[in-house]
Amino acid sequence: MAVFLEAKDAHSVLKRFPRANEFLEELRQGTIERECMEEICSYEEVKEVFENKEKTMEFWKGYPNAVYSVRDPSQSSDAMYVVVPLLGVALLIVIALFIIWRCQLQKATRHHPSYAQNRYLASRAGHTLPRVMVYRGTVHSQGEPSGHREAANSPQVVLGPSRGGRTTVRLESTLYLPELSLSRLSSTTPPPSYEEVTAPQESSSEEASVSYSDPPPKYEEIVAANPGADK
C-alpha cells in the first residue's frame, strides 16, 4: 500500500528539531569529557586525544565509565625489581640442591658397586683356574712301616664342586728332601760350561794305538787272554 503525502504533511513528519545552541553547534568543538559522558570511551581513544601519558592516566582514573583499569607503567617497573631477585634466589636454590644430589649419588655408587660390576666380578671368579697347592708335610720317624711312608708320599687328588658348575681338582702331596740328598747336592761339582762342552776333545793314546783297519781277534785269542771266563 503506497502512501502519498502532500508537501506540508511531509515536512511535518520529517521535521528536524535543533538543539539549544542551534547556531554555535557546528562552530563549537566537542570535548572528550562530553563525548565520553554521552558514550563509553576506551583507553586507546583517550590516549589519542591527550597524547600524553600523565594526562591520560589522570583522566582515566576519574572516569566513571571505565570498563577496565590500566596500571601505571611505573608500578610495573617496581614489580620487576621484586620479581627478578626472587627468581634468582630460586634458581640458586635449585642449583645447590642438584649439586648435593650428585654428591650423594657418587658416594652411594662408590660404596655399592653397580650391577654390571657385580656380574663381571662373579663371572671372573667363576672362570678362575684350579689351584695346585704343594706344601711340605711332616717328616715321619724311622720306626714307621714302609707302607705308611708310601701312602704319605703318594699324591692325593681331591675333587670338589666349584662355581660355574665345574669341579676343582686339588693335588695334595708331601714333598721333602732328606738331609743326605741336600749334602750330596751341595758337594757335587758344577756342570761344565758351554766352552768346555763345545771344545774339540783330544783322543787318548789307547785309541791312537788301535787301528780300525785290523781284523777282529779270534776266539782262541780272546779265551787265552781271559782264562777265568770259562770258569
Curated annotation (Swiss-Prot):
Residues 1-19 form a propeptide. Disulfide bonds join C36-C41. Residues 202-213 have a biased composition (Low complexity). Keywords: Disulfide bond, Gamma-carboxyglutamic acid, Membrane, Transmembrane, Transmembrane helix. Expressed in brain, lung, kidney and heart. Residues 102-231 are cytoplasmic. It is a single-pass type I membrane protein. Residues 140-165, 182-231 are annotated as: Disordered. The keyword Membrane applies. It comes from the Eukaryota. Pfam families: Gla. One of its GO terms (biological process) is blood coagulation. Gla residues are produced after subsequent post-translational modifications of glutamate by a vitamin K-dependent gamma-carboxylase. GO terms for molecular function: calcium ion binding; serine-type endopeptidase activity. The modification 4-carboxyglutamate is found at E22, E25, E26, E33, E35, E38, E39, E44, E45, E48, E51, E54, E58. PROSITE patterns: GLA_1 (PS00011), GLA_2 (PS50998). GO terms for cellular component: extracellular space; membrane. Residues 20-65 form the Gla domain. It is found in: Membrane. The chain crosses the membrane at residues 79-101. Residues 20-78 are extracellular. This is Transmembrane gamma-carboxyglutamic acid protein 3. The gene is PRRG3.
